[in-house]
């Protein structure tokens, strides 16, 4: 994405968050935006939106079929993106809206990669650690399993990382030797 497109995406996202920042339903909107992002990824809709061979009208029709949000603000955002001819930036816009809501509320999703699933007690300890270390609130913890870590975990929150994996520790030891 070039600087011009980045500015367009940022404009849409900031405008949307300014409109909805006082709503009590902001996290419900966040969840519906997450659902839309999942639909776009699962259906490979972004390939169509980025394609130069698909007409602007066809792109608009495809997007309108998935734009069934119960919040008029989300539907208006999507309609604005389509109307302005930026359907190819829809996915990036929705992702940026999520990021801006999280920044506004200082509440973020945490992604944890570990060898084994975490217990609820471990998740709570991890939530507390992340909230203290990064001075933010953790809204949700998403787990991913990866056997190549050998042990430990990697936590990613708002582009910040805590890497306590055995694999990384072994690499550090190897560098020192």
UniProtKB/Swiss-Prot annotation:
InterPro entries named among the record's database cross-references: ATP_synth_OSCP/delta_N_sf (IPR026015), ATPase_OSCP/dsu (IPR000711)
Source species, domain of life: Bacteria
GO molecular function, a single term: proton-transporting ATP synthase activity, rotational mechanism
Keywords, sorted A to Z: ATP synthesis, Cell membrane, CF(1), Hydrogen ion transport, Ion transport, Membrane, Transport
Primary location: membrane
Subunit relationships: F-type ATPases have 2 components, F(1) - the catalytic core - and F(0) - the membrane proton channel. F(1) has five subunits: alpha(3), beta(3), gamma(1), delta(1), epsilon(1). F(0) has three main subunits: a(1), b(2) and c(10-14). The alpha and beta chains form an alternating ring which encloses part of the gamma chain. F(1) is attached to F(0) by a central stalk formed by the gamma and epsilon chains, while a peripheral stalk is formed by the delta and b chains.
Protein name: ATP synthase subunit delta
